[in-house]
Swiss-Prot record:
Record's keyword terms, sorted: Lyase, Metal-binding
Name by which UniProt lists this protein: Putative 4-hydroxy-4-methyl-2-oxoglutarate aldolase
GO annotation terms (biological process): regulation of RNA metabolic process
Cofactor: a divalent metal cation
EC number(s) stated in the UniProt entry for this protein: 4.1.3.17, 4.1.1.112
Biological classification of the source: Bacteria, Pseudomonadati, Pseudomonadota, Gammaproteobacteria, Lysobacterales
EC class (word): lyase
Length: 166
């Protein structure tokens, strides 16, 4: 890894920083990429659908409206996300199968763990702006996460004087 969120914050003081609400559950602590979004409530139908599509290094941001009653991501959907090239998942809600999530090469941030799965009712919105943890998450914006926190920017951030970016 050639970047940290503290270094990015120092270089880009206007970057948006998410409130420190999230715990790491995945096997990858640091991850970054353009974001895709899902808004849902206790139904992971859209999360499952997106994880089955090419991720191309994107980060899936799921606004589960902070529900702690059902897990929106488990080992099967996470393994599918890995197989399809997703860099990570940020969930404003819960995950389950945490022992397995920790072994996968995927960034996973969530509020907590909950063993109960969702009921799939085919509900939820895809690629809509969502807002939680004090940050607007807009499809196509970039998310950077590591052990220090979560940063969001409207474009990829340059990391050197030559204009290189993540």
């Amino acid at each position: 890894m050639t970047w940290t969120t503290p270094d990015l914050c120092d270089r880009y003081p206007d970057a948006m920083i998410a409130e420190p609400l999230f715990r790491h559950f995945g096997g990858r602590t640091a991850f970054a990429g353009p974001l895709a979004t899902v808004r849902c409530f206790e139904d992971n139908s859209r999360v499952r659908e997106l994880a089955a599509t090419p991720g191309d290094g994107r980060v899936l941001v799921v606004d589960g409206q902070g529900s702690l009653k059902h897990a929106l991501l488990g080992d099967q959907i996470a393994a599918n996300a890995v197989a399809n090239g997703w860099a990570g998942v940020l969930i404003h809600g819960c995950v389950r199968d945490v022992e397995i999530l920790a072994t996968l090469p995927l960034g996973v941030l969530a509020l907590a763990a909950c063993p109960r799965r969702t009921e799939r009712r085919d509900l939820g919105d895809v690629d809509v702006p969502v807002n939680f943890a004090g940050v607007p998450f807009v499809p196509g914006h970039w998310l950077y996460a590591d052990a220090n926190g979560v940063l969001v920017a409207p474009q990829p951030l340059a990391l050197d004087g030559a204009g290189g970016s993540i």
